Amino acid sequence: MAAQRPLTIALVAGETSGDILGAGLIRALKARVPNARFVGVAGPRMQAEGCEAWYEMEELAVMGIVEVLGRLRRLLHIRADLTRRFTELKPDVFVGIDAPDFNITLEGNLKKQGIKTIHYVSPSVWAWRQKRVFKIGRSTHMVLAFLPFEKAFYDKFNVPCRFIGHTMADAMPLDPDKNAARDVLGIPHDAHCLALLPGSRGAEVEMLSADFLKTAQLLRQRYPDLEVVVPLVNAKRREQFEKIKAEVAPDLAVHLLDGMAREAMIASDAALLASGTAALECMLAKCPMVVGYRMKSFTFWLAKRLVKTEYVSLPNLLAGRELVKELLQEECEPQKLAEALLPLLANGKTSHAMHDTFRELHQQIRCNADEQAADAVLELAQ
């Protein structure tokens, strides 16, 4: 009598964030099904958990239109090869982790072959290009969503979706230790502290840094003891920021940090930041914030027509109201930014109310996402 085939899960991750999610999912599945087999496109973390890599994740990790066009033939070859090999393997479930442009078509190919498919991490269909939801519905048996309003969106279109909570919410404490973070950064416990996070992309740092620095100068006039911390994502962004600072605010003393954004947020009384994942992380760090964002006029004009949400920052989308101030385009200027930040630095009623709401929202999305994702995979595999 032939031995029963072990549970076989195929996965494709296209970037580092997907590799982290994939590794957490594999770990949770192995705890329940120790002999399960994992194959696909994997990064170093997934491979360390035992995933057999048919292709290295770096093959898919291309950014920007020019880079994608340059690699298009190779990407199409990989997708066709994976379709063929997964069809032959017939895994119990296929999990496409993020990388929607690559994975959703692959999921559709496999679903047609009778393979059960999951898309892990919803694209921002609720915000723009909403018609993508129909392709997602045709291509997948289940979407795993980090945020509750994403599930509500899919429910409207009868696309099966499971809210699993956010892995970042699982990783961060409900009550971070501000003084411990200040000790790490060398910030006095009794000083006022402001974090500036002008973004991770070059264009964001270029557009926002000068106004963020001028805002800090205005706030320093009100709070002479103000410590300013600026975490920068890499050496290139740091060099870019230093050049802008030398022109705009050469005399402003700041703590420039290599990475360490989370520590900076936890240590600070308030943060001024570009939108994006940083706003969610800042909320989970319980740091009151103001979102300031500017883009080229045509890009903003286009975005206003494409984006369907009332707010741009995740804390506001989660709260369903303007919990944090969003100052966009011409509103994103030093005087208005400083006015919005002043009550937060005062550590009074405004910042305490914001902190309490941040904690409530943290609890809402802290659901042990790795375990929830594993539940979804095993239920679909049955």
Swiss-Prot record:
Gene Ontology cellular component list: membrane
GO MF, one annotated term: phospholipid binding
Pfam families reported for this sequence: LpxB
Which class of enzymes does this protein belong to? transferase
Q: Which reaction does it catalyse?
A: 2-N,3-O-bis[(3R)-3-hydroxytetradecanoyl]-alpha-D-glucosaminyl 1-phosphate + UDP-2-N,3-O-bis[(3R)-3-hydroxytetradecanoyl]-alpha-D-glucosamine = lipid A disaccharide (E. coli) + UDP + H(+); a lipid X + a UDP-2-N,3-O-bis[(3R)-3-hydroxyacyl]-alpha-D-glucosamine = a lipid A disaccharide + UDP + H(+)
- What EC number(s) has UniProt assigned to this enzyme? 2.4.1.182
Q: Pathway it acts in? A: Glycolipid biosynthesis; lipid IV(A) biosynthesis; lipid IV(A) from (3R)-3-hydroxytetradecanoyl-[acyl-carrier-protein] and UDP-N-acetyl-alpha-D-glucosamine: step 5/6
Q: Which UniProt keywords apply?
A: Glycosyltransferase, Lipid A biosynthesis, Lipid biosynthesis, Lipid metabolism, Transferase
What CDD domains has UniProt attached to this entry? Answer: Glycosyltransferase_GTB-type
Sorted alphabetically, the Gene Ontology BP terms of this entry are:
lipid A biosynthetic process
Spell out the InterPro entries in the cross-references: Glyco_trans_19
Q: What does this protein do?
A: Condensation of UDP-2,3-diacylglucosamine and 2,3-diacylglucosamine-1-phosphate to form lipid A disaccharide, a precursor of lipid A, a phosphorylated glycolipid that anchors the lipopolysaccharide to the outer membrane of the cell.
> Matching PANTHER family, A to Z?
LIPID-A-DISACCHARIDE SYNTHASE (PTHR30372), LIPID-A-DISACCHARIDE SYNTHASE, MITOCHONDRIAL-RELATED (PTHR30372:SF4)
Family label: Belongs to the LpxB family.
Q: What is this protein called?
A: Lipid-A-disaccharide synthase
Species name = Salmonella paratyphi A (strain AKU_12601)
